[in-house]
Amino acid sequence: MTRIAIVGASGRMGKVLVEAVCDNPDASLGAASVRVGSSLVGADAGEIAGLGKKGVACVDDLAQVMDDFDVIIDFTSPETTLELLALCRKEGKAIVIGTTGFSDQQKTLLAEAAQDCPVVFAPNMSVGVNLLLNILALTAKTLGDDYDVEVIEAHHRFKKDAPSGTALRLGEVVAEAMGRNLNECAVYGREGITGERDKKTIGFETIRAGDIVGEHTVMFATMGERIEITHKASSRMTFAKGAVKAALWLHGVAPGLYDMQDVLGLK
């Protein structure tokens, strides 16, 4: 039985993560945290998630309950994640990171921390999206430079970063398969008189509206035909179940930086 700590247990994703842990027979809810100074400190994490009492009182500092869990699941903010990584390095705990919006410098710090503790870092924990990555690599390699590539993503109005971490990862996979550097070929939105499309660019378009859980489409278009590969998530539980699967896989493995491709055996 793997004991899991949920960070941000009172948030939209946190509540779903608590439910996913409680629903998995191989996992148990070991700890739950909320914001520092929150009025929910001491409240039962199960009751916050609408599941009834689970016997786990929320804390605002996981360092207080280090003996109560084996793996952390975090879908909060880059700043919070880096603080948790420092704790994991010190205590030898494993962590599953679904947080997005990291800068290149923050990603470097994350990779350094993974030298001392096991880390699964993936912008999208769903099985479907991770299968999509493999499909995209094959498609991009086969089609090559004759096809224009556009990545279109849509999320709810509350999402703070754009493009989404998943969209950027989709773009990275396509760029790598085509022998390009995404940092050099990405175009984020278009406005005004832009001139003809540069053949080797990868375009990104972002939609933020309503309660859209997450939709991603990669378009490969040339003269005469267009291929669109799409993934649509209709529930956050899709991501939560993937995160719990990652936590179960991560428990007991050697320190290192892993992703969902490792968890799912797709590499």
Curated annotation (Swiss-Prot):
Pathway: Amino-acid biosynthesis; L-lysine biosynthesis via DAP pathway; (S)-tetrahydrodipicolinate from L-aspartate: step 4/4. One of its GO terms (cellular component) is cytosol. It catalyses: (S)-2,3,4,5-tetrahydrodipicolinate + NAD(+) + H2O = (2S,4S)-4-hydroxy-2,3,4,5-tetrahydrodipicolinate + NADH + H(+); (S)-2,3,4,5-tetrahydrodipicolinate + NADP(+) + H2O = (2S,4S)-4-hydroxy-2,3,4,5-tetrahydrodipicolinate + NADPH + H(+). InterPro entries: DapB_C, DapB_N, DapB_N_CS, DHDPR_bac, NAD(P)-bd_dom_sf. GO terms for molecular function: 4-hydroxy-tetrahydrodipicolinate reductase; NAD binding; NADP binding; oxidoreductase activity, acting on CH or CH2 groups, NAD or NADP as acceptor. One of its GO terms (biological process) is diaminopimelate biosynthetic process. Keywords: Amino-acid biosynthesis, Cytoplasm, Diaminopimelate biosynthesis, Lysine biosynthesis, NAD, NADP, Oxidoreductase. NADP(+) binds at residue 35. It is found in: Cytoplasm. Its EC number is 1.17.1.8. SUPFAM superfamilies: Glyceraldehyde-3-phosphate dehydrogenase-like, C-terminal domain, NAD(P)-binding Rossmann-fold domains. The keyword Oxidoreductase applies. PANTHER family: 4-HYDROXY-TETRAHYDRODIPICOLINATE REDUCTASE 1, CHLOROPLASTIC-RELATED, DIHYDRODIPICOLINATE REDUCTASE. Catalyzes the conversion of 4-hydroxy-tetrahydrodipicolinate (HTPA) to tetrahydrodipicolinate. NCBIfam families: dapB (TIGR00036). This is 4-hydroxy-tetrahydrodipicolinate reductase. The lineage of its organism: Bacteria, Pseudomonadati, Pseudomonadota, Gammaproteobacteria, Oceanospirillales. The gene is dapB.
